[in-house]
Amino acid sequence: STQPNNFLIREMVTAQLQNTGQRIDDVVLIPFMKQSIEQHPKGKHLVVLHTKGSHYLYSERYPEEYAKFKPECMSADGQCTQAALINAFDNSVLYIDSMLVDLFDQLRNKKAIVFYSSDHGESLSENMHFHATPRARAPAEQFRVPFMVWMSDAYIKANPQNESAFEQLKKLQAQKAVVSHQSIYDTVLGCLGVQSAQEQALNPKNNLCSSQWQTSLTSSTNQYIYPD
């Protein structure tokens, strides 16, 4: 079936009785993912987690015990120093790291692959905060984002194709290859081994798990390179 079995939005999670008065952040997604897997133990299973990540106000993206970097920016009035703003942002990244570790731990004994990427970066310099600057003037911090592919040992060993894909990803990591969101569609399907009889449906040049992958960005700018 191409229809989702279920979906939840943040407001629905917040309204649940067991969450009354509780902080609702990205970590709350993990139990829902675990529950979904338990309810569908056999067959192919796709779970999409839409996180808040490190969106402003950064101090609202992590609990107090993750405030490792101080002083932290706690207000939205624009009066925070650059150092405090960066500290709050770093704390939010630290919390996301812990969420990803928890996510991976839930999947280590399964044949699983995880794709993670941010939709944009954030500017933290004076008078140039946040994102959505027009592309022609956007600083690198706004368009250079993390892109992660994680595979469990069971997934890698499931077949030679997965092993080859993993080696290709490690190769690109070692080369510090410049990748972009343009690769997400073909990479997700390609790493999963999806094939299509339609020639134009999948582009191996955009598939990070393929040896045919080619970068679409220069290393120093956000200028796209469109091959003929």
Region spans (language model):
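Active-site-proximal alpha/beta segments of enzymes that process anionic O-linked groups
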Residues: 1-74, 144, 180-181, 186-194, ...
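Short glycine/proline- and charge-enriched loop/turn segments
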Residues: 8-17, 67, 128-134, 163-170
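Histidine-centered active-site microenvironments of extracellular/periplasmic hydrolases
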Residues: 112, 117-161, 202, 217-220
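A long, amphipathic alpha-helix that forms part
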Residues: 31-35, 72-117, 143, 148-150, ...
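Catalytic cores of PAPS-dependent sulfotransferases
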Residues: 38-39, 103-116, 122, 151-156, ...
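A short beta-strand-to-alpha-helix junction
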Residues: 83-96, 135-145, 156-188, 198-203
